């Protein structure tokens, strides 16, 4: 029994000195063995995540720019939206920034600039559309008004035409014109004019118009 106690004591001492090498089973009062609790080691993914958070916190502190640095970057961005490697290094050196920080700032600034262009274009198209809709409504209203005027003008023309027709049918002038049109105008055959030797006495000639009758000589 003494030897067993010594062995257990030695194993317990070894497990305490080297917990990762050997984990003994410590007997409990009921005779059941209970494994000792080992400390969990962090996985590589957890370690990398923590390191990334630490680096991210440091990078966040580096991203804070002064008003003068932002103003100089804005001026450089207005000159050219693209950022070449040489220009990036030069700006970083002049402003005392990290080249990667300058590149990230330009990338974010270009994204905001593109979004602003899209918003401006959308606003312009929206205003043009609204103006077109208003103009279309105005033209539609004008067309309706012109159609009403045309309809009233056609009705007025019809009323005037009926009035003129009724006036002409009841006018005494039109009746006399109709009677005179039916009366035959007398000519030489209606008069007793002889064509013997006395014909010259019954006809009167005007010397002023004798020359105008030369064209009848071809029929005589």
UniProtKB/Swiss-Prot annotation:
In its keyword annotation, does this UniProt entry include rRNA processing? no
**Gene Ontology molecular function terms on file:** DNA binding; DNA-binding transcription factor activity; DNA-binding transcription factor activity, RNA polymerase II-specific
PROSITE patterns per the UniProt record, alphabetical: HOMEOBOX_1, HOMEOBOX_2
On whether Transcription is a keyword of this UniProt record, the answer is yes
Q: Which domain of life is it from?
A: Eukaryota
Annotated region of DNA binding? 58-117
Q: Which InterPro entries match?
A: HD, HDZip_class_I_plant, Homeobox_CS, Homeodomain-like_sf, HTH_motif
Where is this protein chiefly located?
nucleus
What are the protein's UniProt keywords? DNA-binding, Homeobox, Nucleus, Stress response, Transcription, Transcription regulation
Q: In which tissues is it expressed?
A: Widely expressed.
What is known about its induction? By abscisic acid (ABA) and by salt stress.
Q: Where in the cell is it found?
A: Nucleus
Using the UniProt annotation, give all residue ranges assigned to the region (Leucine-zipper): 118-146
Q: Which intervals of the chain are annotated as region Disordered? A: 26-48
**Stored Pfam families:** Homeodomain (PF00046)
Task: Show the GO cellular component annotation of the record.
Answer: nucleus
Question: What family does the database annotate?
Answer: Belongs to the HD-ZIP homeobox family. Class I subfamily.
Question: What's its job?
Answer: Probable transcription factor.
Please report the name of this protein according to its UniProt entry. Answer: Homeobox-leucine zipper protein ATHB-21
Q: What is the lineage of its organism?
A: Eukaryota, Viridiplantae, Streptophyta, Embryophyta, Tracheophyta
The primary gene name is ATHB-21
